[in-house]
């Protein structure tokens, strides 16, 4: 439970009446301290999430944070995560664990996000929904659900949605199809099975960033020079997984999970012909890869093996096979390049990765009010690349990473409603295939010089549940060696290198309380000082980074407050305010995206009439039309650091549910 967990853990339940468009995870996990959410207004690059400063380097997707959906990894075996396959229309709740404490999850530095889909219950029902808004944004959804009709029969939730938008900026339109299904069996022998399958297909144009003058002149624009490249991304992913748990008796339980998936991505970049012609080692301006990935987790949990103890022992296995190609992004027409097409082959390789991680976690209640939690995980990851494009030499290679990851926490239940804890955990983060794909020196082949980062996190916290509300206060320090940081971004291509030492120190505070009946207030604040803790030497044209500089992409202060009236039916509404401090955009700290505050408001009405339920809503985001950067592209080589956020924008929707 909340008070018994010796870590910063936050849970968000799906609201009884939802006023979101059910498109982006940022609509759900607002207000979590140390979780910085950045909506790029760019569906080609997914959301940017960072936790305690980890993940801010990512130019697309999620890094440094493990993602799970119904116990199935939404993070690839190499550590690259996506939120695009998380179905918000059937979401039950989200749990956020800040810090690397848990031994039950794979290697990461920042923390873990666990999302859970609703299970079918009660009568069969159908839900139809439609929402629309600014920039011709629209989403249509269908949800079918029902409870089990008898013993050993499944309950089910099946959802499907279609989303499209013209986008806030020029060349930022997107289309998305998302299908999700969850079947759950509660068997007569006490075991439980969940089977989850999802499919997502996205086509998204990429407006890329703006420099400061371009942003000030017109935040909606795409740089005119980039229009000729038709920069865009196509994504198609299918994944399925099964979880099984069975109590053997009142003291022993078994758990198993297995999953597999396929992901295909084609991305057209804005790299000119002259750049591609300049070196035989250049991989071209089109990225095209297909990944098959799979894994399993097996765990035994036993209670009272020794008095007042709980022990979990398990092993996790993951593997991925990637077929990666690179093509020129042009054809010659009358001797001139015509961009935005797939041209000649410039890269062809087969990449494989696998890991087998045994782990143990134990809890000992050695005194009535004192508990010791410990864990250890041996993480070992093996990369191999076979080069099939040999005209510029054979760049095949392999590398291995491994680390023993201990963790420990001591907690004291001072009062039934008050708990204090101290903890230590070692984190481990390996580079992804994408981070290793290009060398910062411009040479061909994988960047096998990029090593895994290791971190040591120390934390102390206080939790309380009383008549004044639920409180969480935590102070933490994370020291990282060989931190994986950006070496540069240019025309959509990113390179990475290791920073000898970095330091993150901070404070998290969260509070929520039901003030009266269905009126709830929430507030949170985070202070995070993230710096380079040693000089990073110059590398070619990349300048030296002096010790003490702030790590770019991370706000030092962030705050959130909300007030919501959410009855099960009738009139409902709410308002929230978010503050984000300025964010440096490069390692030299020569420029920054300014701080901002944005306000959102929503109102709606829910009718319940027998077997029918109707929910209507309207909302306005960025109520006061603030011009701010929703995200930054760290170390962009063309100084196009800024991805402007939407101005004042509205959305409205209707959901109709019929039970049978």
PLM features: residue spans?
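Gram-negative outer-membrane beta-barrel transporters
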Residues: 300-303, 367-368, 372, 381, ...
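Structural signature of Gram-negative outer-membrane beta-barrels, strongest in the C-terminal barrel
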Residues: 291, 301, 305-318, 349-480, ...
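Transmembrane beta-barrel wall of Gram-negative outer-membrane proteins
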Residues: 132-164, 169-207, 232-248, 313, ...
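Short acidic/polar hinge/loop motifs at secondary-structure boundaries
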Residues: 65, 72-98
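Membrane-embedded beta-barrel scaffold of Gram-negative outer-membrane proteins
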Residues: 245, 253-271, 413, 419-425, ...
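Short strand-turn segments of transmembrane beta-barrel domains in outer membranes
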Residues: 100-102, 112-148, 160, 167, ...
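Conserved C-terminal beta-signal and adjacent last beta-strands/turns
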Residues: 186, 198, 422, 458-460, ...
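Face-selective signature of the C-terminal outer-membrane beta-barrel domain
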Residues: 192-194, 198-200, 234-388, 469-475, ...
């Amino acid at each position: 439970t909340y008070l018994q967990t010796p870590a910063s853990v936050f849970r968000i339940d799906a609201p009884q009446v939802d006023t979101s468009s059910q498109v982006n995870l940022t609509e759900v996990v607002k207000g979590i301290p140390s979780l910085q959410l950045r909506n790029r207004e760019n569906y080609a690059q997914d959301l940017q999430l960072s936790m305690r400063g980890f993940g801010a380097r990512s130019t697309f997707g999620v890094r440094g944070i493990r993602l799970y959906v119904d116990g199935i990894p939404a993070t690839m075996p190499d550590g690259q995560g996506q939120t695009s396959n998380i179905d918000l229309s059937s979401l039950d709740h989200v749990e956020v664990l800040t810090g690397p404490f848990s031994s039950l999850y794979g290697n990461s530095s920042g923390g873990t996000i666990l999302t859970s889909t609703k299970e079918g219950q009660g009568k069969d029902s159908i839900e139809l929904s439609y929402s629309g808004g600014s920039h011709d944004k629209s989403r249509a959804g269908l949800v079918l659900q029902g409870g089990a009709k008898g013993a050993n029969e499944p309950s089910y939730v099946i959802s499907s949605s279609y989303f499209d938008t013209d986008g806030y900026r020029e060349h930022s339109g997107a289309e998305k199809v998302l299908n999700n299904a969850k079947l759950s069996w509660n068997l007569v022998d006490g075991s439980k099975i969940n089977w989850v399958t999802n499919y997502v297909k996205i086509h998204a144009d990429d407006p890329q960033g703006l420099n400061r003058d371009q942003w000030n002149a017109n935040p909606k624009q795409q740089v005119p020079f980039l229009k000729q490249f038709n920069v865009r991304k196509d994504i198609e992913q299918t994944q399925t997984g099964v979880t099984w748990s069975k109590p053997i008796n009142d003291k022993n339980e078994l758990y198993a999970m297995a999953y597999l998936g396929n992901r295909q991505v084609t991305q057209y970049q804005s790299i000119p012909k002259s750049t591609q012609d300049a070196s035989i080692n250049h991989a071209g301006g089109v990225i095209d890869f297909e990944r098959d990935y799979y894994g399993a987790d097996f765990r035994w949990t036993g209670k009272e093996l020794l008095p007042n103890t709980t022990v979990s022992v398990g092993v996790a296995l993951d593997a991925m096979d990637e077929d990666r190609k690179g093509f020129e992004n042009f054809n010659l027409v009358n001797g001139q390049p015509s961009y935005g097409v797939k041209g000649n082959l410039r890269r062809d390789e087969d990449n494989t990765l696998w890991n087998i991680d045994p782990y143990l976690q134990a809890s000992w209640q050695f005194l009535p009010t004192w508990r010791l939690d410990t864990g250890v995980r041996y993480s070992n990851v093996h990369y191999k690349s076979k080069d099939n494009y040999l005209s510029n030499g054979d760049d095949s290679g392999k590398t291995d990473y491994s680390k023993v990851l201990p963790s420990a926490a001591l907690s004291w239940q001072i009062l039934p409603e008050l708990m204090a804890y101290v903890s230590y955990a070692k984190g481990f983060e390996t580079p992804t295939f994408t981070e290793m794909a290009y060398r910062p020196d411009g040479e061909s082949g994988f960047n096998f010089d990029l090593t895994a980062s290791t971190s040591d996190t120390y934390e102390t916290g206080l939790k309380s549940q009383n008549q004044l509300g639920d409180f969480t206060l935590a102070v933490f320090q994370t020291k990282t060696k060989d931190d994986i940081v950006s070496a540069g971004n240019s025309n959509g291509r990113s390179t990475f290198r290791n920073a000898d030492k970095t330091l993150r120190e901070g404070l998290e505070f969260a509070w929520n309380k039901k003030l009266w009946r269905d009126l709830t207030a929430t507030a949170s604040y985070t202070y995070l000082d993230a710096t380079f803790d040693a000089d990073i030497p110059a590398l070619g044209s990349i300048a030296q980074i002096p010790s003490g500089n702030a790590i770019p992409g991370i706000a030092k202060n962030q705050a959130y407050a909300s007030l919501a009236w959410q009855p099960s039916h009738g009139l409902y509404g709410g308002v929230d305010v978010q503050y984000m401090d300025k964010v440096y955009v490069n390692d030299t700290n020569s420029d920054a995206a300014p701080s901002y505050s944005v306000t959102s408001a929503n109102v709606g009405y829910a009718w319940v009439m027998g077997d029918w339920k109707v929910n209507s809503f309207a909302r306005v985001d960025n109520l006061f039309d603030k011009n701010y950067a929703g995200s930054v592209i760290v170390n962009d080589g063309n100084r196009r650091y800024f991805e402007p956020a939407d101005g004042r924008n509205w959305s409205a929707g209707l959901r109709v549910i019929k039970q049978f």
